[in-house]
Amino acid sequence: MLPTLSPPQMCSLQQAICKGAATDAEKVTAIYNYIAGHYTYDAKLADEITSGKVSKYIPDTSATLNSSKGICYDLSSLFAAMCRSQSIPCSLTKGYAGRSYHAWNKVNVDGAWYQIDLTYAVTERVLNANSLYDCVSPLH
C-alpha cells in the first residue's frame, strides 16, 4: 500500500510547505527541509523493533505527521507521501545500511532519480537547500 496523507492534513500542510516553490526541485527541497527541521528520530521505537518487542512494523503516515517523530521507515514513508501529493515520483526503498535494516527514498527530479536519506537529515539536522543534492548522485 502506498503511503498517503488524509486530504485535510495533506492540503493544509502542502500549501504551507511548498508555498512559493515553482519547480519540482524546489518542492522536494522544501519537503526535505521541513521534515529535517521538524521531526526527530524515535530511538525508543527503533530499540523496541531491534529487540523484538515490536514486530511486523508498518509506518502510519498520519501518526508520524502528528507525533513529529519516527524511525527511518516512518520518515521515508512521510517523505514519499508528501512528494506524491505534489505529483513528484518518489519511492520508498528498504535494505541494509551496514548491518542495520534501513529505509530511504528515491525521488525523481527533472528526469533524474536521486537517493535521499531523511534519517540522516533528521539525526544530523542537515538543513541546507543548496547542498540537498550535493550528498547524493543521480541513479543511472
PLM region descriptions:
Residues 74-140:
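Hydrophobic/aromatic-rich core segments of domains that either
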Residues 27-31, 68-83:
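Active-site nucleophilic cysteine motif
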Residues 20, 37, 52, 70, ...:
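Residue-identity detector for glycine
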Residues 4-66, 137:
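Secondary-structure boundary elements
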